[in-house]
Amino acid sequence: MTPSELKRLYHITKVQLEYGLDELLPEHALTQLPKRLRKGLFWIKNKYPEKTLGERLRLALQELGPVWIKFGQMMSTRRDLFPPHLADQLALLQDQVAPFDGQLAKDQMEMELGGPLDNWFTDFDIKPLASASIAQVHTAKLKDSGREIVLKVIRPDIRPVIESDIRLMYRMARLVEQHIPEARRLKPVKVIEEYEKTLLDELDLRREASNAMQLRRNFEGSEELYVPEVILDLSSEHLMVSERIYGIQVSDIEQLERNGTNMKLLAERGVSVFFTQVFRDSFFHADMHPGNVFVNPDNPENPQWIGLDCGIVGTLNKEDKRYLAENLLGFFNSDYHKVAQLHVDSGWVPADTNVEEFEFAIRMVCEPIFAKPLGEISFGHVLLNLFNTARRFNMEVQPQLVLLQKTLLYVEGLGRQLYPQLDLWATAKPFLETWMAKQVGPAAFVTALSEKAPFWAEKLPELPDLVYDSLRQGKVLNQRMDKLYAGYRQSKRQQAKGQFLFNVGATLLICSAVLLTSNITVLASISAATGAAFWLFSWRAYRR
């Protein structure tokens, strides 16, 4: 560990102790090393005893800087790891930091573009429109068309800072696993691995540009969601240029109401957008917190969502979608046995899981929830309780499901903030039933057949040749198998013969030794020579 890393590690430890975060570690669960470390730093006291543990955790992460803020934001979605009072505080973390110098941002952009900004843009505003831990946004206009755009640029020299803190996180996670036995089930090293991948992905704006373009294609012409256009020719790894939009932030309820927005329709469209992304496109925006969602003000009676910042997206494969839909429908119908069986069938929990015990555990958790009116039930919290229960039965962490749960909680929270009477279940159930109907039965068979029709139309003329080639290859394969089997049998016969000759030779040599001790030298010599000959024959048999 370098001196700078030791200094940073001391600072991290000092901040944690100043906010009393050692309370997160139960005394009885600690080995001797962390106990001695705490005693060794006796002069560092909790400066904020009047605040709750959750508040202190949030404030400590804010003080430690952007890498830790983003880590806290990610951890706020892992409610299987943190109790609600901590997760709720982590969800309040804001990724807003002081902007860096606008001239430095301009220099970075010009380096990415390979020339002065004036070659491509006019009216560049050196004052940032927004600033976050990873990137900063400035406004300008395209020189050739006058179109308003925004330029998002990665903070210079942010990667070394991130990599340094990530290395320290790994060291701390390994120490936690080694010295706090109760924490091992939380797999802290694996948590850091997930975070590292997410964070490093955000450093490549080409990935975000690609995600935004895909989401824009998926909702092209839609009244429900608009995604700003990316100017791909001017974008690179550390710079993304896109269309500038004007909208009302979705959390600004007063402004939405002043604009005459149809709040009920807006809330329902949020749910529709989510389920369309998941079940139609298998590709969903996984960071839909209020800062990334705006509302188009132009047609308030027919409101349209605007999605920004596509750095984090989720995908589901066909099997995940089917099992997820069937699980949700199982909940709608209170069929907990089906929900338990689906978890086993999907491979989300081990195949040897006792389905009856699992069903009982799900029922115990979910029945009190479903005793409420449907309109008061949180869809996201049902999924959260389900996944937490499943993890007690050794369910492996499914990153795509964690992102899905996080996104659903965001969408549901926004929807009920916009329209408190929103019945997400009533909105979602017809959608799920329609989707399931398309996946099974005659209609699904016809759809699958039609999707494969171009492939089979291309391959049909080749079918006779393919059949002939398959038969010929099968015949050749059988001949090879027969030859290999014959060789195997011959080899076994030779081995048996060699073993027999070896045993006879050994017996004769033993006899020659006995005869020699009895001074019967002639017979001893004959027996020894014959035994040696048998050994020679056995060696030749093995060699074949």
UniProtKB/Swiss-Prot annotation:
Q: How does it sit in the membrane?
A: Single-pass membrane protein
Molecular function per GO = ATP binding; protein kinase activity
- Which GO terms of type biological process are on file? regulation of ubiquinone biosynthetic process; ubiquinone biosynthetic process
What cellular component terms from Gene Ontology apply here?
plasma membrane
Q: Which keywords appear in this protein's UniProt record, sorted alphabetically?
A: ATP-binding, Cell inner membrane, Cell membrane, Kinase, Membrane, Nucleotide-binding, Transferase, Transmembrane, Transmembrane helix, Ubiquinone biosynthesis
Which residues does the Swiss-Prot or TrEMBL record annotate as the active site?
A: 287
Per the UniProt record, which residue ranges are transmembrane? 515-537
Entry's SUPFAM superfamilies?
Protein kinase-like (PK-like)
Q: Main localization of the protein?
A: membrane
Residues reported to bind ATP: 129-137, 152
**Where is the protein found, in the record's own terms?**
Cell inner membrane
Task: Give its E.C. classification number.
Answer: 2.7.-.-
Pfam families given for it?
ABC1 (PF03109)
Q: In which pathway does it act?
A: Cofactor biosynthesis; ubiquinone biosynthesis [regulation]
Q: Where is the Protein kinase domain?
A: 123-501
Q: What does the function comment of this entry state?
A: Is probably a protein kinase regulator of UbiI activity which is involved in aerobic coenzyme Q (ubiquinone) biosynthesis.
Give the matching PANTHER family.
Answer: CHAPERONE-ACTIVITY OF BC1 COMPLEX CABC1 -RELATED, PROTEIN ACTIVITY OF BC1 COMPLEX KINASE 7, CHLOROPLASTIC
Please give the family membership noted in the entry: Belongs to the ABC1 family. UbiB subfamily.
Q: What is this protein called?
A: Probable protein kinase UbiB
User: What is the native source organism of this protein?
Assistant: Aliivibrio fischeri (strain ATCC 700601 / ES114) (Vibrio fischeri)
